[in-house]
A protein has these predicted regions:
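Structural motif
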Residues: 194-209, 216-220, 247-255
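Charge-rich, solvent-exposed alpha-helical interaction surfaces
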Residues: 181, 185-188, 210, 227, ...
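Long, low-complexity segments enriched in small/aliphatic residues
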Residues: 237-265, 269-270, 275-276
C-alpha cells in the first residue's frame, strides 16, 4: 500500500484465511526501496534549527525537498520508485526459483502489479489486484489526485447515508444537506475548538484528518460517527481521544509517500492561474472537506520536485496482458 508502506507484515500470519492459504503456499512480502526495513530509508525530516519561520510557503516546500535529497541521497532517490519496484519483484521471483509469479496486491500495490504484468506478461501465473489503481494516470498527477478526491466524496456520501439510516450521527442522507451539516460542524470547531483531557485543542483540522482516515475502512465508520455526534454535542470521550491520537501515518511513511509519488509522476510547471484552477477543482471534487482556511496557491511538493524516473517513457502500453489477472473493487 501507499506508496510508502511496508509489504512485510508479520501479523498477517494470524489471519485465519492466511492460515488456510499457508497449507499450500509460502507467503512472501517485501519492503520496496527506501521503505520499512529496506535501507537506506527515505528520510525528509528536518531538525528544529532547520525549520524556519516567517518564510514563504514555496521556500518551506523547497526546504523540505532539500532535506529529502540531503538525508536520503540524490543517487539513492534516482533508483527509488515504482519503476525499480517492478524490476525488484522479478528479481525476487528469480531468486525464489519460480518460473512464474503468483501474487496478491492491494491499493498502490496494484499499480506495481499492473506494471509488472505489462512489462513481464509471460512471467505471470496469477495476480489478484484489490483496490485497483489506474496506471494510465501515472503521467498526470493532477488526474490521479482528482480521482482520489472524487472517490473520497463518494465514500463520504455513502457514510452519511449509513449514518442517517442507523441514526449513528446527525448527518442527513441527502448529499447536499450532509455536506452543509458537516461544514457547520467544521465552522463551529474552527471558531470554538473543543479541549481534550490533555488540554489539546480539537479543531476543524483534527476532524478533517480523522474523517479522511476513518472513511477508508467501513469497520471504522462507527468511530467516525461517534466523533461527529460527540463533537456536535460539544463532548469528547476517551474512545475518540484515542482515535485522534493514533498516528495517521508515521513520519517515515509520509516521507516515502511524497517522494515516490513525485519520482513516479512529477508535475509540469504551472502558472498561478493554472495552479488555482487545479486546487479549486480538487476542492470541488471533495466538497465535504472544502474548508481549508489557509489554502495556498503556492506550488506543491511534486511541482517543485527535481528528480524523476523514466517510468512513463519505458512503459509498454500496447502489450497483451496475461489472462491470469483478477481485478477487485475498482
Amino acid at each position: 500500500g501507499g506508496p510508502g508502506l511496508p509489504g512485510i507484515n508479520p501479523y498477517i500470519n494470524f489471519d485465519w484465511p492466511v492460515t488456510n492459504l499457508r497449507e499450500s503456499w509460502d507467503i512472501i512480502g517485501f519492503d520496496p526501496r527506501g521503505v520499512g526495513q529496506s535501507t537506506p530509508t527515505i528520510n525528509c525530516q528536518q531538525s528544529d534549527t532547520e525549520i524556519q519561520e516567517n518564510i514563504t510557503e514555496k521556500q518551506r516546500v523547497l526546504n523540505k525537498i532539500n532535506a529529502c535529497i540531503h538525508n536520503t541521497g540524490a543517487e539513492v532517490i534516482r533508483h527509488i520508485g515504482s519503476n525499480e519496484a517492478v524490476y525488484d519483484i522479478d528479481r525476487i521471483r528469480q531468486a525464489l526459483g519460480d518460473k512464474q509469479l503468483t501474487a496478491v496486491a492491494y491499493s498502490y500495490g496494484t499499480q506495481i502489479a499492473a506494471l509488472y504484468a505489462e512489462r513481464f506478461p509471460y512471467n505471470v501465473r496469477s495476480i489478484v489486484l484489490d483496490g485497483v489503481v489506474d496506471i494510465d494516470d501515472l503521467e498526470d498527477n493532477f488526474t490521479w489526485q482528482l480521482k482520489q478526491a472524487q472517490s473520497y466524496q463518494e465514500t463520504f456520501d455513502r457514510f452519511a447515508s449509513w449514518c442517517a439510516r442507523t441514526k449513528s450521527c446527525p448527518l442527513s442522507s441527502d448529499r447536499d444537506k450532509a455536506i452543509t451539516q458537516f461544514h457547520e460542524l467544521l465552522l463551529k470547531l474552527h471558531h470554538r475548538p473543543l479541549i481534550d483531557s490533555k488540554g489539546e485543542n480539537i479543531s476543524s483540522d483534527e476532524l478533517i484528518s480523522l474523517t479522511t482516515d476513518l472513511l477508508l475502512w467501513r469497520s471504522s465508520w462507527p468511530t467516525l460517527a461517534t466523533a461527529i455526534r460527540q463533537f456536535s454535542q460539544g463532548i469528547v470521550s476517551n474512545e475518540i481521544e484515542t482515535a485522534l491520537s493514533a498516528p495517521i501515518a508515521s513520519e517515515e511513511s509520509s516521507d516515502a509517500l511524497g517522494v515516490i509519488l513525485c519520482v513516479d509522476q512529477g508535475d509540469e510547471k504551472l502558472t498561478p492561474e493554472e495552479r488555482k484552477s487545479r486546487k479549486d477543482a480538487l476542492a470541488n471534487a471533495f466538497p465535504a472537506i472544502n474548508f481549508d482556511n489557509g489554502r495556498s496557491d503556492s506550488p506543491d511538493f511534486c511541482e517543485l520536485w527535481p528528480i524523476h524516473s523514466d517510468l512513463n517513457k519505458t512503459r509498454l502500453k500496447n502489450t497483451v496482458l496475461p489472462s491470469g489477472l483478477l481485478f477487485v473493487a475498482h
